[in-house]
């Protein structure tokens, strides 16, 4: 089980300052998770950590600064760099984002041993290509091994789309081998037998352009997830097949204008939005990629954030969830009280300052329902992080 986060800043600071309790043969891996805003980076970070310490919401730019999560398992330490979504200066200005939000993903890449590129396949608008910002990031650091993670595959009704997406997002090349989609009609697509990744001659793309596809499980290490198509009575069995490709040996900066995908991914993983099973497969893979080296953190550390930062972020997550449009972005949070109660419970009082009376009414809600719900849900999340009772009181006032 992951350790709880300390409730006092002093205790957390002490843990962060502590010399790591190095095992005999320590191994370490620093992982940058990058992707478009709202791709699910923080959700994945939380799943890998086994405890929710990063804020998550449906709105973009929930993560405002880079924070580190720490997974310590036996002699291995994974350091997860949870970063804001990669965006451009124009969009940053529109969302009133600080300059650090443009800089942080790039800074994370500088310190990473491996990069996970997360793509939300349920988003029709963004799933067919990697954003220019992501491609720019990858081409700037071609020496860092990268892995493609397709997220929310369970929300995709037509599974054959995954094959097209994989081909587009990898430019048809994974781990130096050319991917090919091979289709054969079969009467029973519900078969659970695993089909290995095979090396075969690539067929011309025009031949298979109009054939129906349906994805069966390919090599487990390559995909990290199986997909069930038992609903099709007569479906096509399709395998991703790899052959040696004359792909670029060194992926340096290049003309990104016409690129939609990245031909230097080492692996592909497919994850369901809320299921832990595939995340465990990914976690095992990451633990195997760790290299000998000293731990950065004591094994009692779960995150580099202070308890107050975690609290602010979790309350902010709820504001983003329950307030419309731009309203949550204008709320200023001020912690009035943070202390231990007589029975060891954590007592928190936070002021939420808003610029307009209309915003105040929305935040309080009819009969105080909205603010009560925010306090209740945020309080529960904080209990799960700190593993102690939390009494959270939220007050709403106008900015003076």
Language-model regions, residue ranges each:
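P-loop NTP-binding site
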Residues: 299-400
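Signal for well-folded cores of large energy- and translation-related assemblies
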Residues: 49, 53, 68, 72, ...
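Conserved C-terminal guanine-recognition region of P-loop GTPase G domains, centered on the G4
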Residues: 71-78, 99-265, 338-343
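Conserved GTPase G-domain signal focused on the G5
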Residues: 40-41, 155-165, 188, 192, ...
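Short, structured loop/turn "capping" segments at alpha-beta junctions
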Residues: 176-181, 292-298, 325-331
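Conserved G1/Walker A P-loop phosphate-binding module
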Residues: 1-119, 351-353, 397-398
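P-loop NTPase nucleotide-binding/switch module
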Residues: 1-29, 89-92, 144, 174-176, ...
């Amino acid at each position: 089980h992951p350790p709880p986060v300390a409730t006092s800043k002093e205790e957390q600071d002490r843990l962060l300052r502590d010399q790591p309790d190095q095992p005999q043969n320590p191994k370490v891996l620093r992982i940058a998770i990058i992707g478009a805003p709202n791709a699910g980076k923080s959700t994945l970070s939380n799943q890998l950590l086994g405890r929710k310490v990063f804020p998550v919401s449906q709105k973009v730019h929930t993560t405002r600064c880079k924070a580190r999560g720490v997974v310590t398992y036996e002699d291995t330490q994974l350091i997860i760099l949870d970063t804001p979504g990669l965006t451009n200066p124009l969009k940053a200005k529109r969302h009133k984002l600080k300059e650090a939000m443009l800089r942080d993903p790039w800074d994370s890449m500088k310190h990473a041993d491996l990069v996970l590129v997360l793509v939300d396949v349920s988003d029709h608008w963004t799933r067919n290509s990697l954003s220019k910002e992501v491609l720019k990031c990858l081409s700037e650091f071609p020496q860092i091994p990268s892995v493609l993670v397709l997220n929310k595959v369970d929300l995709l009704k037509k599974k054959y789309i995954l094959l097209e997406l994989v081909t587009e997002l990898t430019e048809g090349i994974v781990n130096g081998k050319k991917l090919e989609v091979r289709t054969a009609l079969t009467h029973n697509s519900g078969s659970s037998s695993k089909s290995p990744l095979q090396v075969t001659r690539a067929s011309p793309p025009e031949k298979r352009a109009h054939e129906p596809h349906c994805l069966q499980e390919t090599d487990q290490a390559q995909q990290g997830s199986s997909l069930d198509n038992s609903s099709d009575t007569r479906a096509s069995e399709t395998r991703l097949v790899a052959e040696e490709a004359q792909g670029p040996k060194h992926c340096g900066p290049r003309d990104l204008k016409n690129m939609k995908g990245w031909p230097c991914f080492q692996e592909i993983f497919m994850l369901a939005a809320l299921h832990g099973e595939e995340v465990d497969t990914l976690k095992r893979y990451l633990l195997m990629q760790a290299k000998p080296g000293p731990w950065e953190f004591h094994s009692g550390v779960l995150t580099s954030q202070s308890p107050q930062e975690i609290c602010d972020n979790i309350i902010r997550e709820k504001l983003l969830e329950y307030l419309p449009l731009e309203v949550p972005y204008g709320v200023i949070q001020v912690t009035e009280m943070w202390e231990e109660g007589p029975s060891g419970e954590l007592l928190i009082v936070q002021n939420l300052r808003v610029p307009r009376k209309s915003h105040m009414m929305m935040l309080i809600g009819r009969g105080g329902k909205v603010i009560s719900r925010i306090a209740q849900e945020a309080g529960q999340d904080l209990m799960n992080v700190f593993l102690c009772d939390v009494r959270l009181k939220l007050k709403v006032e106008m900015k003076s």
